[in-house]
């Protein structure tokens, strides 16, 4: 009798087990879909934030670039005057510092949102921030050189101003390269429809 009961109940039990299995698999698939959607939304927010940061950094560079070009020209005039033996007195040879941010990029990396970005976008943005890091290191070195220049200006003003001209010149060259990378990357992202 128990075998007969088992035979009758077996299809019901198998159907119930299949429905439970299907329900569990459906729930897991729905959870995976939701998590994937959340990750993609995070990556999209991170990308928009990074693009806004790059735009802001570009504006900062545009401002400081003009000022540093003017300062470089003024420093070259001062150097020419000093080399010609004319006293320039208290010549103002200075440097405008660009305050660039990488907070959005660092946040995108720490939140692991970059894992869900298109590989080419991630590579392009990595290049932007790599060059920005180089620029910031060169800028810090230029600030150090300018500080040293002020310290040694009384002993050898020609050498001090020459060092200032070199520092500003190197920074200005790298400045142009960084702006070009910013613009190219932004243009590419907009053209491909990744951002507005």
List the predicted regions and their residue ranges.
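N-terminal positive-inside, membrane-proximal cytosolic segments immediately preceding the first
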Residues: 1-21, 29, 33-35
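Surface positions of alpha-helical coiled-coils, especially the charged/polar e/g heptad sites
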Residues: 39, 46, 50, 57, ...
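N-terminal alpha-helical signal peptides/signal-anchor transmembrane segments
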Residues: 50-76
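Conserved non-transmembrane functional hotspots
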Residues: 66, 77-80, 84-88
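Soluble extracytoplasmic domains of inner/organellar membrane proteins
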Residues: 82-83, 89-196
